[in-house]
């Protein structure tokens, strides 16, 4: 890091190159070696992977290769990795000889090459085959291990005893362990098909190959175990899909920790270490599974950085909408480093983020709690865990109370005595029965399992057990029967005195004494006192509940916590753990544990053995028992095509136990075992294939039936060996296959597939009918109307069943009155011919009866029915029937049949409104298909459309007939012009007319014309005429119809057709005709009844060649005729399938050969090919050269049967999608492009559709025609049959998909907030000061920082311009505004000022239909008006003057002159600010964060919410940040330069990506703060200043000397690379982060627009446009002059110097390097930013203000603009009489006229602005409420109170530069201490 800082310090000095010389010397050898070893052109996105893998590649490779990264990996493996491993004599297997020779030259130990031809491709790869196996200790197998099984490798080690190490390269994707989608799609892709893995390197399909899917098992095993030999497997290296594996003889020694028992416990491991391997995958996290759903792991892997960023984002925004996570994901999904993520994973990620965004960790951080509060908080958080821990203790405590003799002591009166008498005697002692000893109880019960303990000892366990158990009292009573126990119970012994006393009293009581005497004798108790006495004793309340109560009480805690766990909330600790586990998943790692592989017996390494294997010992037994046989239903695995061994492959999965190599056969088929019973009784080890007579390789054995083909899943095997050598052309050792064993039944063990169960339809399962299902007309052949009796039925067998009458029986009730038959009789009759399944089903129950039943009724009762439906009259029944009934059908919903209304008098039933030709057109078929329309439509003409067209035709603006043949004399009224004049007069009196019409629409070449021509050839349509837009199309109609010469008048062009009359009019290519032509044709022909129009709305519209035509102002025919399109034919007969496939259109013209046969480029014109060009002039030039040609537009509708040539020129890039579609679809063979191949580059400056066609990329018509394509009702195949079946609410064939299938997104208002998911609350403080962002597009919101301001606003309020001085007003000479305005505008022709280029005229001086009242012309003609909506030529004509383009798409390279000049300008800019150019200030992160918040505020407040929503594309992640959209600025700029001026180029605005604005905008605001801090007082910049500030500065600093002003010509375009250097140096001076500086330089040197790449010019719209222009201007001024302290004013390209300074000495040298054009002027009345300035102050230019007033008055907008103009006027008015010293004499009358107008027309509250007194609140309220529009200068000129009131009165600011932002910048400058 220190060296890098030192080099950066030397960047601008001459010492840097010598300092870097050692660095260059150190990398020279490495770079040279890398270029020689890896010379291939590795893609840029794969280089980081290779470098991370330790491969020293370079980015200077020049050799192309179809898969360079794989070639680099292989080269590194062979010449770096293997080169160091080969330390002994080695052999190499499966390598081309040339590659081996190169390897041998690098390392002499590579001695032998052995190749074996195992597959057909090996004969090409290997010119010869080795006759023996390798015999060296080291063997290197090149890219073949994936085709081998462990048994085969074991066989190789058996055959070659010298072999110790086998080094193998394995190519297999490790992620195939769990998915079929690559994790490195740029490096490789693969697919899984059955048991085969198809591997494609780097998208190179020709280099793809197949390999067994079980090849992955080599990465999952660590050893191969067999009875005689064990092999160990080690993964040495892994480079993505390439792995280096070492297979060694023997196993490694066991871990010493398992063997040495004397090791300390911490060093001794009881189990072996886990053999875990991991592989390189992108950094990702695994999303959790959805609840109770299974989602594949591959679709749950998302990038770690995206997940963490999205997690933070969803919790950082204040309001999260439903679309915000998806918008954030969209900003990341298109990044190249995320190609491996699947669309399902992105979907799961945004869904997961959306659904889990409300979750927050339920934690608290209470650090100031006392111990009691901490205990309380701990218990509240962990009470459930504490309860669960205490529950077992409570359970044991309940049982302990039962077992232990615990009691509760209570006080009780023992005795009460008085006068030596007991009033309350103590209770007699009662001895509870004692329990026997446990041992004694067991002895008395004499249990068989009890053994008495030795004498003197007791069983402690049994004693404790019985003491814990409570023995009920009943059991105790039974135990008393044992005398041995009760004899052991002795009473408590008494002392001798008590014994003597008791004996004496007992003797006295036995004497014959009187009772009274005996009553006074003391008994055997204590003496009773004389005085009253009460004694107490303690009574123990036993705590011994019953058993059931004790057990129930013990279970209460457990049940309570179980219920709490099931139904209660999760405890906080568990919530915390689940939250972090669920929302912060660990990084995904692709790893697994390797396990041993058991191989019971080896299988041949090759399909032929060179030497027999040594026999195994007889007493040898396998290490593991043999596995059970495979189930017979499991098919063998398929093998790979290259170097694949023939042995059977194991079951896919983990390699645990290998299957035996011998084939399983029945015992009777074994020729070596004649005694099946004897062999069945023994269990010998499996026999190895290495015997003296090796068996033939395994082959699929057929079954006993010779007709059964072999299974296609069985592996292909080779024959046995007949010769040890192969000839050069031979593939392998092949021979005739051995005879097959006819008794082998291996394949017969496979289960036979069961035939699928046939599900019968209700009709076939109906028991009331018999026979096959046939149509009703076949079963009952009669003359039914077409397509009415084609429904399926069967022959009725049983008599009518009493089916109930359905509730939807309106068909029967509609037919019954006309037939005079009861509906129930009709219902019964239907049951005689139709099965019950057709009469009782869900259709009849839900939607009603169909016309199928009406056909059946017509057969039964011999009638025909006319059904009057909404789509016309439809006939049902018998054509020959005499009885005709009428019924009516309405679609509803619900659909309904009804009888005809009653006939009154002799009136017939009401006639149908159907056109008489409609039925004929609907029934007509051409080659078995109907015309693609549903019904006739009623079209009502628009007289306004017709009048507009005929007026333009009469004047010659549209069409040519009115202007041709001027010299020919016609009879009066018969010339074309006179006829059009007469037609125009007729249209003036015409009324709207309605005719029938149908529209045939479809893709180009779909066959609209041929079927219609056949229809017109029929008799009903013979009276027709055809109108075409071109003569070429008219000639095609003539040729195809082939009518007699007398009928040629029926084919005419569109103008001559207006002068003819027929009943039927056919208009071909309607959309190529002028708007209103259809209306004019109908109104001009009184005989017209039917109109048939053909056209494709996708193939473009009519465009008038006259700039004076107003036809384009009418509504487009594509949208006007859209409701009449019933079907859009989505197929083509003309376009070749190669081209049709680009549009996803089915084509009947199948292409032959390669795609280039249909679409290709050419170097010259091809004879016989028709040429399509862009313009008429080009077509005439090509025709003059002898080649047939026409314009692309004129070729619409024409079919060419040869290839057409499309001429490309610079206009091809501007072709519309409609024209390019026409060009690509004209030929039945194909197209070829000739000319400007740059139009096919696929960039912004090319034709998109042509580019996609030449590169065979799909063309999305939805994006090419976004306004109309989604509205077209696509018909995917021709209509072969029209359904006349009516049922339900609609007819299925005429269902309009436009109404249901297409759903346009609804308009969402900006205030819509119902899609909020999370709305985070505001903690503490007041309302959030940030602006709302919920209306921003989802892709814009992640770019918004939403930082809160860190510094509080404590600055004082800005002072107004009011003063307390004595008010004074200037003296005006007096001038009437209206009188001066009447003669201000000179009489002139505004069209002379317009510019005409390429037959297009500008419209900057519109005058037609413009109001005017002040003078003889509209006042808007004073200056050019720029209106892009009204002037389509504005931007194209202005581009040459406003933009400067690069010659190529390569980035602009900064030259040495740019660096030199940029540094010179930077030094002079620092001199202007009095700065040290070498000083670099520290970066202030806090201030920069404030600037980010301020920039966000400015972006949200400077435009309305509707504007931000409308500009949602600016945050589109698919929009490259270097791409800029250029558009014209709409303005009516009125100043001294534009008044009475000519055409002027507009100002271009650059629309940049939001990323650029939000990233670099804070940088410019950060710089602006430091510039304001450093700016000396004599420097003035107008940014953020009001006119009052300008006037005050002028009064302070300007003098009365002659001023020097300058305004540059094309200032923005004149700034080249030096401006980029200047801006980068300005940012480096403030230590702006380097990535932002690099971003700025990258943008300036890589800007691309829709018109082409731009140079390093200034773009209006880039961040900091004004500041950078002002700094550039100021740097140029200080480079030109020696300014010192001369006052200077700068504002963009405008500047003013107080007096003439001396020139700088270096100016002449600097001037030659600049590209600026100066417009310097010396004057005493300088004009700066529209204000005349001087020592007296500043005043608004009265000439411009007067002109603006005139324009506003004539535009009737003065009421809205008057306050703005008055505010600008007040700045100079308040100067008093001093203002006259600032104005030139020629402008003083306009100042007086403006004052006259304001005095007479402004209301009093507005005129208060002219006063110098402070405005009262009432006036401020009136001004703010009446303000609708304010200019920027006017807004700044308002007092601060009014500005705040105006802002508060508006819901959202719409000022181009919010003045609050300048105020906040000023506050930041005051708040931060520098």
Swiss-Prot record:
Biased composition (Pro residues): 619-635
Site residues, Cleavage: 905-906, 1288-1289
Ranges of residues in domain (+)RNA virus helicase C-terminal: 1130-1266
PTM: Specific enzymatic cleavages by the host yield mature proteins.
Domain Peptidase C21: 757-912
Limits of the (+)RNA virus helicase ATP-binding domain: 972-1129
GO molecular function: ATP binding; cysteine-type endopeptidase activity; mRNA methyltransferase activity; RNA binding; RNA-directed RNA polymerase activity
Keywords of this entry: ATP-binding, Host-virus interaction, Hydrolase, Methyltransferase, Modulation of host ubiquitin pathway by viral deubiquitinase, Modulation of host ubiquitin pathway by virus, Multifunctional enzyme, Nucleotide-binding, Nucleotidyltransferase, Protease, RNA-directed RNA polymerase, Thiol protease, Transferase, Viral RNA replication
Residues bound to ATP: 1002-1009
EC number: 2.1.1.-, 3.4.22.-, 3.6.4.-, 2.7.7.48
Residue ranges of domain RdRp catalytic in the record: 1601-1707
Active site: 810, 896
InterPro entries: (+)RNA_virus_helicase_core_dom, Alphavirus-like_MT_dom, DNA/RNA_pol_sf, P-loop_NTPase, Peptidase_C21, RNA-dep_RNA_pol_alsuvir, RNA-dir_pol_PSvirus, Salyut_dom
Residue ranges constituting the Alphavirus-like MT domain according to the UniProt record: 58-219
GO biological process terms held by the UniProt record: DNA-templated transcription; methylation; mRNA modification; proteolysis; RNA processing; symbiont-mediated perturbation of host ubiquitin-like protein modification; viral RNA genome replication
Membership in a protein family: Belongs to the Tymoviridae non-structural replication polyprotein family.
Name assigned to this protein: Non-structural replication polyprotein
Species per Swiss-Prot/TrEMBL record: Kennedya yellow mosaic virus (strain Jervis bay) (KYMV)
Taxonomic classification: Viruses, Riboviria, Orthornavirae, Kitrinoviricota, Alsuviricetes
